[in-house]
Amino acid sequence: DLTLDNERIAAQRNWYSQHQSHLDRVTLRAARYLHYTVSEAEQRGIPTELALLPVIESSYNPFAYSHASAAGMWQFIPGTGKIFGLKQNWWFDGRRDVIESTRAAYDFLTQLHSKFGSWELALAAYNAGPGAVQRSINRNLAEGLPADFWSLRLPSETMSYVPRFLAMAQLIKSPESFGVSLRPIMDQPYFRVVDTNGQIDLESAASLAGVSLKELYQLNPGFNR
């Protein structure tokens, strides 16, 4: 619910509004991928705001790697990646691949929404794990307390994670209302998927595509070799 407002959301929104340079970096990086992630959400009939989750997870960096061994712009750990069909081998890491990781993330989020019945709880479970969220729900219910996200006791990171996501979604929807400016992102595909039918030299591929080698690398981050 993007109309929701409380102190926790406002605190995150204020942080973003005071860090314009961070927003500039994120929107510049997201420009390559956002049309694709939004389009995929639309095709699935899930909230398009979910395409903003990589802003929170990785600042939309498909090469991001965390201390917990999470990788890619959706930050899958190895085990969860395998559950959702992301190949991880010497040649390729599907957690970093834009197409594969987006499919897996939306599969995971849809599954979590089916389990918990709200997108706020689904996002919390994406961050903390479904087990942690379910235990917190059970604890509240046993104590006769509400079991919505805002009433749960969860790890501190998760307690700020959902408000941060909602704050970002509100800023993107109405930046002028909160005193921030955002780089425009073209409402058209930045890339298209091409099957090479086998291995191809990257320099040759870049030449055929009419892009720089660096740009081709940014669009194919899943390849280790």
Question: How should each PLM-predicted stretch be described?
Answer:
Residues 1-39, 43-44, 83, 88-115, ...:
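Extracytoplasmic and endomembrane cell-envelope/extracellular-matrix remodeling and assembly machinery
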Residues 7, 63-85:
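Short, surface-exposed glycine/acidic/tryptophan-bearing loops
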Residues 47-54, 71, 119-124:
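Alpha-helical scaffolds flanking conserved acidic
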